[in-house]
Amino acid sequence: MDIEWFATGVGAVVVLYILYHFIRITLNILGPYVFCQPIDLKKKAGASWAVVTGATDGIGKSYSFELAKRGFNVYIVSRTQSKLEHTKKEILEVHPDIEVRFATFDFTNPSVSDYEKLLSKLNEVSIGILINNVGMFFDYPEMLHKINGGIDSIANVTIINTLPATLLSAGILPQMVPRKAGIIVNIGSVAGLATMAEWSVYSATKKYVEWITGCLQKEYGHQGIIFQAITPAMVATKMAGNPNTSFFTPDSDTFAKSALNTIGHASQTTGYITHQIECEMLKLLPDFVIDRSIKQTSAQLREALAKNENKPLM
């Protein structure tokens, strides 16, 4: 009798465990992307300006256009002035009723005083949304001691993938806290969701983005400020080296629109429904399967780059 009760109890626990994960996965996939309606971003932001870093290409540029479409003035920040000027012109041609400003900034090797100067410019306007998008990847996946560019490249990737989200958030929050309103979105990567051989620095820096965003949401969420970590998989951008779209690979415009619609519904999500499906499946796989898949992906990326450059990668 005792054995029967024990077996029944274990069975019930297993069923509840499976049911819990099924409900969690279903809500993570369908909640932000199907069930929930987009919130009033202007009301939650509490101000009319949106700042976007890494705004002249890919996801950052698409965020800038989508925010302009939704009526925000846009302050774009990137390294190259000519590209900033061109992006500003493009935005105003489509959305002439908003204002666009820009600031040139090299995120790879800034001093604290450089950040203070940038923040002084940004804080001239009332910022309701901050999109910390700027980021960097290596030329191709590689073991730490073999990374192309050596410790200089390693330092650049570490700095650019961690400091901007941290320091710009710290410098703009003093605007948002008194208003009890504001939105800060930090763009990470699905690469931060698993430990990845040959992606060690990139994966670790993207995990940092996810982690600090979660910490800051707990610090400031009760004050009316939204923090969100977006962890996309493959998006058809120049940085990804893949201009072709597919069911699992949206273009950056489609992605940015989808990701903005999840604000207020998920503090950490991939930003796109098929990416969320990939993410939830990834979490169910054993490590050895993930490791094998990552190894194959890394080899394919190196092979593709070698083919483009007509030389082997050692």
Curated annotation (Swiss-Prot):
Transcription regulation found in the keyword field: no
GO molecular function, one term: oxidoreductase activity
Protein name, as recorded: Putative steroid dehydrogenase 1
Binding residues for NADP(+): 47-76
Main EC class the enzyme belongs to: oxidoreductase
Alphabetic keyword roster: Lipid biosynthesis, Lipid metabolism, NADP, Oxidoreductase, Steroid biosynthesis
Species, as recorded: Caenorhabditis elegans
Keyword presence, Chaperone: no
Family to which this protein belongs: Belongs to the short-chain dehydrogenases/reductases (SDR) family. 17-beta-HSD 3 subfamily.
Active site feature: Y202
UniProt-listed InterPro entries: NAD(P)-bd_dom_sf (IPR036291), Sc_DH/Rdtase_CS (IPR020904), SDR_fam (IPR002347)
Disulfide bonds: none
GO annotations of cellular component type: endoplasmic reticulum
One GO BP: steroid biosynthetic process
EC number: 1.1.1.-
